[in-house]
Amino acid sequence: MIKTSWEGNCFLNFFNNKVSLGNVDKTIFKSKSTSPYKLLKSTHDQEGRCILPVLHTAGGLVGGDLLVFEVNLEKNSKVLLTTSSAQKVYGSVGISKINPKGSFSKQKNLINILDNSHLEYLPQETIIFANGLYEQIFKVSISETSSFLFTDLIRLGRSSSGESIESGVFRSRLEIIRNNDLLDDWEYVDQIELSKASFVAKSGMDYMPVFGSLIWICEKDFSKSKINNLVRKIKKIFNKTNNNLSIGILENGISVRFLGSSSQDARKCFFRIWKQIRSVSGFCEPKYQGVWPLQDSMNY
């Protein structure tokens, strides 16, 4: 039988090579991957942070595709992971006579962050085409002295073409566990399902096709006053947009939600929040990445 779906794997192991770049060390990596994953050229910023764009060469996902993405940060590593294009999930419902209900394309993300390491995972948006079925799972393990920043931007349908999600479904589960000497603690759990029902509901998305999440988990001993100051600055960012935004203070970090009609607005908002997080963490100011949409670069 001919297989019509992808089963792709990518494993990334980042570590500090102890080679000085002025007063900082440089994070490098080893990798192992199969199609459709392809790693683009990595670069470094002035803090030795490894900046790595990942490309999905197939151009999109269809029902039955399975991707496994594993990331490991050894001690004293700094990493910015992103993607070079939006992830497209094509329609599955009603396509096959054998399986008219369709099948989910799935991505499993396993992330392990060891002591004094910092991961920023900022992929571009996921577009769920009409009748697309997609499920993603994130399992993150993080030490008490490390941090994790993650953004997730979802567009339901191609609204410019008058398309909505129809019978499609987006599912996401994020689990973050904090490692310590005695036992592992649950740091954060988030589960989301978006469908036509949630898209049209007044108490849901109310026909706004773009939904975004930004999660930042900081070090266990990070200053609470700094977090409160960060929240005040983020609320000022909210005042400059006409979209729906909310923020929650976690035990160790923050959670931001975006709801609107423009992916560009969401990217701009999250970029500004990212700058504030870098600032409060004592890191260098982030730069707009060359693999991101060119039309955004002049507006940030």
Curated annotation (Swiss-Prot):
Q: Name one GO cellular component term.
A: cytoplasm
Question: Does this UniProt record's set of keywords contain NADP?
Answer: no
**Family matches, as Pfam families:** UreD
Where does this chain mainly localize? cytoplasm
Name the domain of life. Answer: Bacteria
Coiled coil ranges (UniProt) are none
HAMAP family, A to Z: UreD (MF_01384)
Please report the name of this protein according to its UniProt entry. Urease accessory protein UreD
Q: Which gene encodes it?
A: ureD
